[in-house]
Amino acid sequence: MNHVISDYVKRRLDFKGLKHDKSKIEATKSRVIRAFENLPLEILNLFLDGSRNLSIKIIPDPKLPFGMRTITERSSKELVYTLNICDEAQGWAEDHFLGAVLRQLGHITAELPPDDEWPKERGARARFKESIECKADALVWSWGLRHYDMIYLSETYPSHWVDKIVNDISMMMLTMGKDQ
């Protein structure tokens, strides 16, 4: 199975436009492969069988780097996902990086809609964004990978936000009927 995952990631990972040393490229590939290896089989198969159309791009840091973000586009037949990973994220500690990738895979598993399908009003849009982030986190937790998500959250947000996010995830998991 590891060979299948490795081939899948290599076909989807795009470093174009960035100049890196070979060791940095190999380290990033290895980390992305490890994230996929941690997925439960039924979730992994969504990617391997093409049910989730994914490309992964390593991009130059914008003026305000965002770490990682999934962009969704709707084609005539399906949702197409692009996981953009800013160059800076390649330097993150491995568990932080894995937590971030797993969270993005949670978005894709949950079929994150394109931005233009989100609510238009500012408050409603913010609440929607918060709910989809929480859903992605809850999925990662339900996969038994809470520790990676917690590392990502604590490296990314102030502690008082992490407390709120953890509470929201716990509440969502209760409504989903899943154990933490």
Located regions from the model:
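A short aromatic-anchored loop/beta-hairpin motif
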Residues: 8-17
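Post-HEXXH active-site segment of zinc metalloproteases
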Residues: 95, 110-138
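Long, well-structured alpha-helical subdomains associated
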Residues: 145-180
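Auxiliary, metal-adjacent structural segments of Zn-dependent hydrolase domains
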Residues: 16-78
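N-terminal low-structure segments adjacent to metalloprotease catalytic domains
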Residues: 1-8, 109
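Active-site scaffold of zinc-dependent metalloenzymes
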Residues: 55-95, 105-112
